[in-house]
Every structure is written in structure tokens, then in C-alpha cells.
């Protein structure tokens, strides 16, 4: 599986996990949502360990850009709130930064 695919799956797992707690604590849903949230967050953490990177911090930093784009997509698809142009511009800037971190030339 490619790094990008792992990042996308990790983002969906993290967002779903956090949303489980949001649904429980903010939307008054059943505590079962929190249990699902915990399971999803465990999957998220396991997925990030599959990234090929020389340092954990680099893998996590690059993931941040993908997380932001996935969060904006979640906002529109799941919550029905359309991202505005500033959301989209910010997301593109963050994704460009993530690409530099992940794919930039390295000197040893």
C-alpha cells in the first residue's frame, strides 16, 4: 500500500474516532459511539506505523496535510457543511507542505 493510501486511511480512522467522541459528548449519542471512537483511534495509530519514513516526526508532520484535506471532505460529506474558499486554500497550502516534508530531497 502506498504512503498516500495509508495516510488517507489513517485520516479517516482518526476523524471517525474523534467524531465518535463528538457524537457522544456533543450530540448526546450513546456511549457506544465513544467505544467505536477508541477502536477507530487504535486503527489510526497502527496505520501510521506503516509509513516508510526515517523519523516518526516526519511521518506525523506529512500526515497533517492529508488530515486537513480529509477533515474538510468529512465536513462536507458527513456534516453537510460546505468548506469555503479559505478552507480550501488553506488545505491546498497544507497539502503542499506535507508533500515537501514527505518527498523533499534529503541529505545525510
Curated annotation (Swiss-Prot):
The chain crosses the membrane at residues 4-24, 27-47, 59-79, 85-105. One of its GO terms (cellular component) is plasma membrane. HAMAP family: UPF0060. The lineage of its organism: Bacteria, Pseudomonadati, Pseudomonadota, Alphaproteobacteria, Caulobacterales. It is a multi-pass membrane protein. It comes from Caulobacter vibrioides (strain NA1000 / CB15N). SUPFAM superfamilies: Multidrug resistance efflux transporter EmrE. This is UPF0060 membrane protein CCNA_02055. Keywords: Cell inner membrane, Cell membrane, Membrane, Transmembrane, Transmembrane helix. Its main location: membrane. The keyword Protein biosynthesis does not apply. The keyword Ribosomal protein does not apply. InterPro entries: UPF0060.
Amino acid at each position: 500500500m502506498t504512503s498516500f493510501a495509508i495516510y488517507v486511511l489513517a485520516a479517516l480512522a482518526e476523524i471517525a474516532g474523534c467524531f465518535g467522541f463528538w457524537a457522544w459528548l456533543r450530540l448526546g449519542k450513546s456511549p457506544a459511539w465513544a467505544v467505536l471512537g477508541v477502536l477507530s483511534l487504535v486503527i489510526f495509530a497502527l496505520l501510521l506505523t506503516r509509513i516508510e519514513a526515517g523519523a516518526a516526526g516526519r511521518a506525523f508532520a506529512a500526515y497533517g496535510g492529508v488530515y486537513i484535506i480529509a477533515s474538510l471532505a468529512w465536513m462536507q460529506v458527513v456534516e453537510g457543511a460546505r468548506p469555503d474558499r479559505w478552507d480550501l486554500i488553506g488545505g491546498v497550502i497544507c497539502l503542499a507542505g506535507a508533500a515537501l516534508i514527505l518527498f523533499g530531497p534529503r541529505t545525510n
